[in-house]
């Protein structure tokens, strides 16, 4: 147990009240509200607690608390909730009894997580080896990926996985039919394989059949399937090894959906590219773009998340929550089912800190 977790357990750490909200589709209980009713505006999940991180998969959610515990809910047909069964859960269930979980990431139906000791764990669907455990057998409880204690950044991306180690090396495994593993081929791998020899990778992300990564120098890279230009390279050609997106060196975050990509720069601007159907790129149109286009002129964007079904959610530095694009079952949280082709604010609150969008639902943390 680290010092923060120990202080929390002892009651000496000042834990602020943090609330978790959800909205959108709820067929598998992915909203965590104890039912399967969809809601087009935010609904609070239980009482305020010490929620820390959230990760939204296709129809499930995994979340950590400040005390290091791990929780999950929603679809569980492949064991992606990690609770030792395959039954869907419509309210948060604790994953084991450990209090050392640090980071989580959710793919289509598999989950990756790191612990405070730097170990990497996985569970859920494993048909393509996306769990990285050397087999294609699905697991309903956490299994350690190798024996290393140096994992830093992770991304469970649809049907493949990406990770960065503390030495800056990049690793990938799982499905690879479009070259999304970045290994220069289309071979599937059920255990981690290093992507090139560079040691300057910082963060990873991606969408359906493609990958994104940012280096320590602020450059953005992409590879894999490139339908609709979602790689941002100015074309629709697929690549099986990393390609730099433009020449800029100030990218901060990135997020991939099924056919579109979002990113922020260190100057607070937000950018989008790929399939613009339903207005998912925030350009006030439904045009496709194969290279980055700025979303408006604001320089106050903090984070962006590209939803699976052409929706987009973003948080500004003032804590306001915004959305645009496709709005099936109210994934944009506006209380309606209307699509929007440019950013619109979700309510008037100014205390949102994190947001994640699954296929057609959203989960967010508010202080």
Outline where the language-model segments fall:
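Short coil/turn segments that connect the beta-strands within blades of beta-propeller domains
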Residues: 18, 59, 68, 109, ...
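Short glycine/serine- and acidic-residue-enriched loop/turn motifs that recur at repeat junctions
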Residues: 21-40, 74-90, 123-140, 173-193, ...
């Amino acid at each position: 147990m680290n010092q923060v977790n120990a202080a929390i357990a002892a009651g000496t750490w000042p834990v602020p009240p943090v609330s978790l909200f959800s909205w959108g589709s709820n067929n598998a209980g992915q909203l965590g509200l104890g039912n399967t009713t969809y809601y087009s505006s935010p609904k609070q999940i239980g009482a305020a607690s010490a929620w820390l991180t959230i990760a939204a998969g296709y129809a499930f959610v995994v979340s950590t608390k400040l005390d290091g515990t791990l929780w999950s809910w929603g679809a569980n047909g492949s064991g992606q909730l990690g609770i030792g069964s395959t039954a869907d859960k419509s309210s948060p269930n604790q994953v084991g009894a450990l209090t050392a979980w640090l980071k989580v990431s959710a793919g289509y139906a598999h989950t990756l997580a790191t612990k405070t000791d730097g170990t990497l764990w996985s569970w859920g669907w494993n048909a393509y080896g996306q769990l990285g455990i050397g087999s294609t057998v699905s697991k309903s409880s956490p299994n350690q990926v190798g024996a290393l204690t140096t994992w830093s950044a992770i991304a469970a991306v649809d049907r493949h996985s990406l990770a960065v180690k503390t030495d800056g090396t990049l690793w990938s495994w799982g499905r690879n039919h479009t070259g999304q593993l970045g290994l220069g081929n289309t071979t599937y791998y059920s255990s981690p394989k290093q992507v090139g020899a560079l040691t300057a990778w910082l963060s990873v992300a991606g969408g359906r059949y493609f990958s994104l990564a940012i280096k320590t120098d602020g450059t953005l890279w992409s590879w894999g399937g490139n339908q609709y230009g979602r790689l941002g390279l100015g074309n629709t050609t697929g690549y099986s090894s990393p390609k730099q997106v433009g020449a800029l060196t100030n990218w901060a975050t990135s997020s991939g959906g099924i056919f579109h990509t979002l990113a922020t720069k260190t100057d607070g601007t937000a950018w989008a590219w790929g399939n613009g159907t339903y207005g998912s790129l925030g350009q006030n149109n439904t045009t496709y773009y194969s290279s980055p286009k700025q979303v408006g002129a604001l320089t106050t964007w903090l984070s962006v998340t590209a939803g699976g079904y052409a929706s987009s959610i973003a948080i500004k530095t003032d804590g306001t929550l915004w959305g645009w694009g496709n709005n099936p079952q109210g994934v944009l949280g506006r209380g309606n089912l209307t699509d929007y082709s440019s950013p619109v604010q979700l309510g008037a609150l100014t205390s949102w800190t994190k947001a994640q969008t699954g296929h057609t639902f959203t989960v967010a943390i508010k202080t």
